[in-house]
């Protein structure tokens, strides 16, 4: 099964080797037929402490690194 890749924005980089990434997605509500925007936060591993708040990054699914981290930052802008 291929690993999932998500794009989002770094909203916190205060922890050592960890960033919090906010991923937004849009979908059409099945009953009301309105587009709804939903966001979710992921803790991602940043081994070089390279990314700061506001950076756009891609994260990839991986094995569990800690209790909450199962994503790794692969590249950013």
Swiss-Prot record:
SUPFAM superfamilies reported in the protein's UniProt record: Nucleic acid-binding proteins (SSF50249)
CDD domains: Ribosomal_uS17
A cellular-component GO term for this protein: cytosolic small ribosomal subunit
Pfam families: Ribosomal_S17
Function: One of the primary rRNA binding proteins, it binds specifically to the 5'-end of 16S ribosomal RNA.
Subunit structure, as described in the record: Part of the 30S ribosomal subunit.
Family: Belongs to the universal ribosomal protein uS17 family.
Protein name: Small ribosomal subunit protein uS17
Gene: rpsQ
């Amino acid at each position: 099964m291929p690993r999932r890749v998500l794009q989002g924005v770094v909203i916190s980089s205060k922890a050592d080797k960890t960033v919090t990434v906010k991923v937004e997605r849009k979908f059409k509500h099945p009953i009301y037929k309105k587009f709804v925007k939903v966001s979710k936060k992921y803790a991602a591993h940043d081994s070089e402490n390279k990314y700061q708040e506001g950076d756009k990054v891609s994260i990839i699914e991986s094995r569990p690194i800690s209790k909450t981290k199962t994503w790794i930052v692969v590249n950013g802008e």
